[in-house]
């Protein structure tokens, strides 16, 4: 046992190749390194290429500044996702995910084998994104402690975890899914089908659930049940029921919010604009921040209605519009003359440092797609949300924001949106009685987030317990291996 304890634990971390997953992985890596772990952080070549193109000064190693500022042992490497850099992963979504499903694991396997021959200390633990289907296979082969990192709310994990119940009760994967309230999932008091993740809202009559996305879902949420530990980017006090239901099944630790307000690690896939000068001198809480995240697409018709609605509202705004927000092959999507009409009242940028902008006192609300990182950051900064979910977990996240925590409002109940809806709801969010109620509620949720990460808070306590348990499991595995090696001579 003493020999095992003398070896520094070495964790390999592999986020899913999407910016919203990379960000919490980066911050967890830094935190684990500060607790004495050696970290090897693995990005895909494609993700690294986008980051290095956007941040020319950090083109080689995104953790170089973090290492020099904190003396952390974080090593950085990249691996192919099976496609050339110029392959359009956005336009060829299904083909890309076929590669992630079938090819990517072989590259990870080769990397671990190479590192085990070369690195000191050897890799002893894998922290992989829950959406990977091969984590258990890799960990079994290389005798690694298996940790699954869930970057979304516990409610979403809990629903995916119990897909078998949704199927057997006819709410998912049925020819004509039931439309009544779902009240039989452990830890979920009641949820309507419209609040399920978008992948679970479809029936077999509408969609082929044998496609690659569904094969990934079915395999990933079977594989997570084999993990030694699951860590979640959420807070125990915000989702006690879902977390308790999951914790009854296996070791699950709520360690969120996993982000940093002053990160030195570049994670953006696009060059960032500095909005500080534009915000300077604007009245407190007068600016609406609008962003629909790093992944989801919005139709050109919807972009046009949102643009006109923002102008009609009379509210000042910063609108983050990725170049591929409509599609990588649709460069022009704003209505003619929009930027001129907005004049000094509106700023349009392709990307920015979100935390830097929304923490500015001039910003008073967030018009969002309901990505989980954006929700956590918005609450941290005390901003109410105008919710326009687009896909996957965002519909379920909206339920938490609007129905459970009462810190946001819906943009619309149907998929079709109008400029009048946008204008009216922007004004509701930013001013008046509804706005005041939302801000009071946000402050309560914000206290839960900030209390959780204090030295005696639930997330910090859970993190320290997780670290201790991982160390113990690594030591046990190393001792078992050493025991097997020396047993013939006994």
Swiss-Prot record:
The keyword Glycosyltransferase applies. One of its GO terms (molecular function) is UDP-glucosyltransferase activity. The keyword Manganese does not apply. UDP-alpha-D-glucose binds at residues 294, 352-354, 369-377, 391-394. Belongs to the UDP-glycosyltransferase family. PROSITE patterns: UDPGT. It comes from the Eukaryota. Keywords: Glycosyltransferase, Transferase. Gene3D superfamilies: Glycogen Phosphorylase B (3.40.50.2000). It comes from Arabidopsis thaliana. Its EC number is 2.4.1.-. Disulfide bonds: none annotated. It holds the Pfam family UDPGT. This is UDP-glycosyltransferase 86A1. SUPFAM superfamilies: UDP-Glycosyltransferase/glycogen phosphorylase.
